[in-house]
Amino acid sequence: MTPEHLPTEQYEAQLAEKVVRLQSMMAPFSDLVPEVFRSPVSHYRMRAEFRIWHDGDDLYHIIFDQQTKSRIRVDSFPAASELINQLMTAMIAGVRNNPILRHKLFQIDYLTTLSNQAVVSLLYHKKLDDEWRQQAEALRDALRAQNLNVHLIGRATKTKIALDQDYIDERLPIAGKEMIYRQVENSFTQPNAAMNIQMLEWALDVTKGSKGDLLELYCGNGNFSLALARNFDRVLATEIAKPSVAAAQYNIAANHIDNVQIIRMAAEEFTQAMNGVREFNRLQGIDLKSYQCETIFVDPPRSGLDSETEKMVQAYPRILYISCNPETLCKNLETLSQTHKVERLALFDQFPYTHHMECGVLLTAK
């Protein structure tokens, strides 16, 4: 695979290999055949980051080869959304001959939605001034004249200039209902929107007929919490990053959801609060004891759950675990399988043509 060529003819074979590999890894814990969710074979990534290489009068996007560290010129990127590809061409054309916009520009980040909105961030090794803002506004207007629904942001050390706004609103059809998700620049969002829809619908399916409330640790912009709210009496979710909490609160209002409560705190602090070890001012007005959380949802980083969180989740009758690293999932299952058994197993092909696998398991108490 090269950045400008995807081996689409090999899609089925690479997916089949992942299914076999996941089944083998999960064999000590389950004999289930994974439910398999396919990605689009191209234009599946909704975000991408590129370094910018200056070559005389020319400049262009590059990425670095992971093995050799050599730079690779990238003029098109079929893994990314069609909108990102349009913007890559338009941004280079708009910046190449503009001394103020191109000087000390070292990176461009793209974030797009299925609803065809985009935020483009230009990263600089220099101070950004009013002259930069004027030129950036002219570029933004020129891009919009090409029917590109784009917002521009300039970034430098300790500086962020958002010309209009630093977010876009995604609209996803989830099990017959359109969900609105505000996505903030430089915050985590699911990279493969088509796969995100399938993950959310799978999570809805496995939690059908749930009793009681749902607890989610590290909910981000509320991606899972809000979609799953229809299956539970109430949802209690924690998140530590302020921009994500603000986006989640917006998403709750935009989707007219009245049974989700977001708390800004770390999982460890939440555990202390739940167990009555410590009191927190930010929990005033929230009666934790009134929640009957029968299900806990976790979507940890690549490192998986730490041992304290492992112990915490074992206290819940049902654990819904989305993993971006099956190796650490299996490590966690060595502990979790002592008290819980795997009821459902899914493979989500979030990153086609790479070694990476995303998977989901539903665990129920033995």
From Swiss-Prot:
Superkingdom classification of source: Bacteria
Enzyme Commission number(s): 2.1.1.-, 2.1.1.35
GO cellular component: cytosol
Name of one Pfam family that matches: tRNA_U5-meth_tr
Residues reported to bind S-adenosyl-L-methionine: 190, 218, 223, 239, 299
NCBIfam families given in the database record: trmA_only (TIGR02143)
Protein's name according to its UniProt entry: tRNA/tmRNA (uracil-C(5))-methyltransferase
